[in-house]
């Protein structure tokens, strides 16, 4: 039987500044090559859990440790941060604090320089992993010239050069827009498939991060693991609600459409779910019914009501809107309805309001 590469046994940790333990009686094994998602609400203990693995706890951040933690068959509590970094690579949420070099290339080559690797080999390694993380065109750029997603990729490339068997990513989607976040997850999955490393992703944005490429999900609540299961089984359970985590909206939609989610084999794979003819039929029926009800509702309700609305900007002497009572404006025709200034500058809106 394969030995776990990470093993927690009755493990608890309490910060010196806290009155109660942040982690309580953690018992979990993670095996070589697994891809694990760690989720939980803010303050649930998920980042502390990750820091115990990468060595920031207890070697940098002090506290009281009880129980056992073994990493790569070594007692993690008697090692040191330097030795741990040879086994566990971490991409921090704040990549600015992890950037060391003056350029992207220098940052990725930092460890190779410390290990006195030959220049030719160093350049080959940097180019290889820069290509893998899609940063080959930005190697000569300074940190301040890179976006948050690009800095993250540089940090990831520097970790991959070290080829550690365990890779931790602490909230990799935190500072990314949805499109970049999706691309980042695709990149991480490709890297996991190529390197066969043990990958642990810590996230609170469940809907954006969860899919069926994860072997397991660890769900934290109040410093405890309340679920250790597959993505699909987690979505079928009530554990997310118990932990204060909103389930993916498509799961909610399926329930509104009266789809039996328990009967769906791979609920974590949205594409497979959408290909089911039974699901298509149920969802279409629900949408048609909802749309019909909405049409009847809006026939008897105004699209927009204004009641004594006044608007004046600091750089304008006159009011843009002054005691407006009602304006039947077609809000569907307004491109940027969320921008009040743009709305008020529209000639169509001005005419309707004046009228």
Task: Go through each PLM region and give its residues.
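Catalytic Walker B motif of ABC-type/P-loop ATPase nucleotide-binding domains
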Residues: 167-171
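Conserved beta-strand-loop-alpha-helix hinge in the C-terminal portion
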Residues: 224-251
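Conserved ABC ATPase signature
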Residues: 142-146, 150
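Helix N-cap at the start of a conserved alpha-helix in ABC-type nucleotide-binding domains
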Residues: 178-180
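ABC ATPase NBD coupling module
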Residues: 64, 74-89, 234-235
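Conserved ABC ATPase "signature" region
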Residues: 120-138
